[in-house]
Amino acid sequence: DVTVVASPWNFPVAIPVGGVAAALAAGSAVILKPAPPAKRCAAELVAAFHEAGIPKDLVALAPLEDGDVSRYLVTHEAVDRVVLTGSYDTARLFRSWKPDMHLLGETSGKNAIIVTPSADPDLAVRDVVHSAFAHAGQKCSASSLLVLVGSAGKSARIARQLVDAAASLRVGGPASLDSQVGPVVVPDDEKAVRGLTTLGEGEHWVLKPRYLGDGLWTPGIRAGVVPGSEFHLTEYFAPVLGVMRVDTLEEAIEVVNEVDYGLTSGLHTLDTEELALWLEGIEAGNLYVNLGITGAIVRRQPFGGWKRSAIGSTTKAGGPSYLLGLGEVQAAPEGAAAPEAAHSTPTLAPRVRALCDAVRDQLSAAELAELRRAVAADASAWESDYGANRDVTGMACERNILRYRATPVLLRAGDGTALADVARVLAAGLLAGGPIGVSVAQELPAPLMSVLLAAGVEVSVEDARAWESRLATVSNSGGLGMRVRILGPREEASAQRWDRATRASWGSPDVALYTGAV
């Protein structure tokens, strides 16, 4: 097994360490392909792995410039998967080279902080300025949008403090120990330069950025950013912040969610009702309340996003599920010991219980027993992990809560799929509670159809050609964050389903495909 870790330049050590270590832990050899500006850091990192005892044939360095040779590496038939930290455009480029690439990505972010009238203005300004301009705005988690709600958008105090705080930051090279804003690493990046120099319609500078040479820019703040504008929707790796004004928190949430990305997001408020509304409605992977939105810490704040900020079957880096994306689930051999949870008798959700009852007469005794063990294990995992908000750090000064959110899922059961497998996957989907669509090659039993219709699950009977046409439409029409679970005959290799699905979806990075065994 071979994994290519394609790491960025903005975290030249921490991110590749995480990717390489995770791939090794999952049992894969690793080729580290760093971004060109970070090649020297990557060389030292690989040497450290070797000095620690990792064999040289398990961790290799490919210090390549971007171009044909890099393309040859990531598309090589011997590479089983690519772990990318970079832009969404890079993920799309990789998939255009090889549509069936197993690509796991943490990609772009267009991140915002919302400030409501109830916020502490001093604390809010401090966190906005740090989140926008530290590292010269070159963290994928950096905030390039400030959304002011109601009277906060008319506050002379907030406006004055924001401009004063940003203007007072010390700009300088890395050799200056007092530098607070360093150089733009790729100074000729067209998008970054545009963000620092070109205003959109109705926008104006309240703090105009200045170029000092050697890649150094003073911070810039533009006001008058409107929904749907380029600055509202585009990620800029540069020290520039755009200010938007809305009347209500509901409008602010809508404005933030209009962006195709969902990496980090922040809220400054002292109102618990506002906090509850925001937590329920905002679409981002890492949420920060009355804090800056950068600087996630492994385990305490595992890192990863929604929509176009996450590619493939990846989960949060530094979190408890990260290794799951680096392997494939396989059915346990017959007679293997079942997990302890499978022997417990947790309370089943009513919909799950109804599903089991609906297929009881269509399954063999062995299949029914296996389904019951599976849903019991699901229920136990739901109670302890997936359905519970957990703070594993237990810090006295702050709460770090890990929660799971249901996302839309499209299930396809092709010709020859066992009903037991369909029931098992549907049981998990009904428990999670997210929107489910089902495509089947053969009609499902009437009792099962009744349960699904009562649960609001749309079921379509379609042949392979109709299904592939549907998958192509879903994959290329903005179905951001969609999960597609594809089942087939148990004797069929998951790689065959993967190949068919990636061809049908044209390698779109906007959907995550799951084709493994049940």
Regions found by a protein language model. Give the residues of each.
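Extended, low-polarity segments enriched in aliphatic/aromatic residues
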Residues: K39-A52, P447-V451
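Conserved C-terminal structural/oligomerization subdomain of aldehyde/semialdehyde dehydrogenase
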Residues: V4, N10, G53-K56, R71, ...
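Conserved short alpha-helical elements in the N-terminal third of ANL/AMP-binding
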Residues: G19-A26, A427-L431
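Short gly/Ser/Thr-rich phosphate-binding loop of adenylate-forming enzymes
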Residues: L84-S96
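A short helix->loop->beta-strand "cap" motif at the edges of active sites that frequently abuts
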Residues: S28, K98-H102, G434, A504
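A short hydrophobic/small-residue beta-strand
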Residues: L24, A29-I31, I436
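Extended low-complexity, polyampholyte segments enriched in Ser/Thr/Pro and acidic residues
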Residues: Q138-S141
